[in-house]
């Protein structure tokens, strides 16, 4: 009927109108915003883009790091009010949608999509807060190892282990993976071997092939993995990570009807990260000291970037929604203040903060994804906890993991599925376990570095 057609059309318009803040931000950040070239210690210029920024922050050349950092934030800072306004628009949209559907808050609505109790979110933040002294300790160690008196935000990404060569040809990587995943038992390894032997993996870069790596497939197909192999240790991690997704999909599809064979976004990264944790454990036991150091450095960075950083993001995201929900003015100045406060809390007094970092929120696209980022930290914690159980308990933990988690798809709420597999995300325990793994790695790293 004409009426249903016009109602469908108005729905489309409504969706388009409501996604304006995100679209404006995306266009601005990816297309319109330009940065001055970064300059290195020899005065040589380097083109600064969203893609090269982190690469320059990882550089040995402190002048280049500082220049990239200053130029990026000066560009964003020049539009601080505009970007505050687009993010406030996004927050208002989330609150409007929540109230229109009779939810008390934007967070309640966002989490209810996956039936995630709000205590999971609060529990993540509260538990990570308890372990912030560990992050401060890591940051202090970074300062000592870099040998600088004034640790700045642009010194946070540069690797602490230099000049260690670690080539990883694909055939060797397959061996490492199979050995690392041995604790998972025959049923799991058979799936991985089937994937390797039946060409699930498109390994090397090719003309017209998309960059990065990902797993895909449909209910009746095998999972497929696309890689762009370049013989690095991170390629090995990517292989193990993507096989985690593929095995999860394989077990889900084989054991669930098509309507419940796809798993929820809340648990999407758990299987892949659990595999990475098993790989780290195995490699840690089988590498010489130099390579172990390289690995531990990368591991500690992964913890910092995933568990700590994403929790800080989650805390900021919730804070700006609370400000708006309380009827207080949500301005860019207020956002800068709240962000600076959190950055200080997370990094402690070891880092000399500056005005730029208070505007970091304005370069993070995930704040336009409506309570999405916390799942990186919860998923990471769940994976660390599960891998810990697999390595310490053995068979019973493996059976729980495969039968209660990998084979379950979305046949139950994600929180319940994880609970049955041995991880209760409404309690502090999984996050505590993850933080304790971080602590062990930090101790091992410090001991090797000072030895």
Please tell me what each predicted stretch does.
Residues 1, 7-119, 123, 127-130, ...:
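His/Asp/Glu-rich acidic catalytic environments and adjacent acidic regulatory segments
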Residues 107-108, 113-187:
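A metal-dependent hydrolase signature that marks the N-terminal structural subdomain at the beginning
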Residues 115, 144-154, 239, 247, ...:
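C-terminal, non-catalytic "cap/extension" segments appended to globular domains
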Residues 197-225, 344, 348-369:
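Flexible, glycine/threonine-enriched loop-and-boundary segments that flank and lead into catalytic domains
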Residues 243, 267-280, 379:
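An active-site-proximal "capping" alpha-helix that borders the catalytic cofactor pocket
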Residues 161-219, 232-233:
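Auxiliary, metal-adjacent structural segments of Zn-dependent hydrolase domains
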Residues 220, 224-239:
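Short pre-active-site segment immediately N-terminal to the catalytic Zn-binding motif
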Residues 249-273:
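Post-HEXXH active-site segment of zinc metalloproteases
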